[in-house]
From Swiss-Prot:
Belongs to the bacterial ribosomal protein bS21 family. Coiled coil: none annotated. This is Small ribosomal subunit protein bS21. Keywords: Ribonucleoprotein, Ribosomal protein. One of its GO terms (biological process) is translation. One of its GO terms (cellular component) is ribosome. NCBIfam families: S21p (TIGR00030). It comes from the Bacteria. It comes from Thermodesulfovibrio yellowstonii (strain ATCC 51303 / DSM 11347 / YP87). GO terms for molecular function: structural constituent of ribosome.
Length: 65
């Protein structure tokens, strides 16, 4: 859980910017988007296999250059 310590001289905008950066670093928004809708285990497996194939194809393409 991100938390921001606001000093006396910090403005609200600066504190909000720091909070957004911490949320982005921890991957909170991507996690929320991922959990927005239920995904069946079979669909998760298919996506995982597809991502692995795509990664392998990209690696092979880079090696062939």
């Amino acid at each position: 859980m991100p938390s921001v310590n606001v000093r006396d001289m910090d403005s609200f905008e600066a504190a909000l910017k720091m909070f957004k950066k911490q949320c982005e670093r921890e991957g909170i928004l991507s996690e929320i988007k991922k959990r927005e809708h239920y995904e069946k285990p079979s669909v998760k497996r298919k996506k995982k296999v597809l991502a692995a194939r795509k990664k392998l194809a990209k690696k092979m393409k880079m090696l062939s250059r």
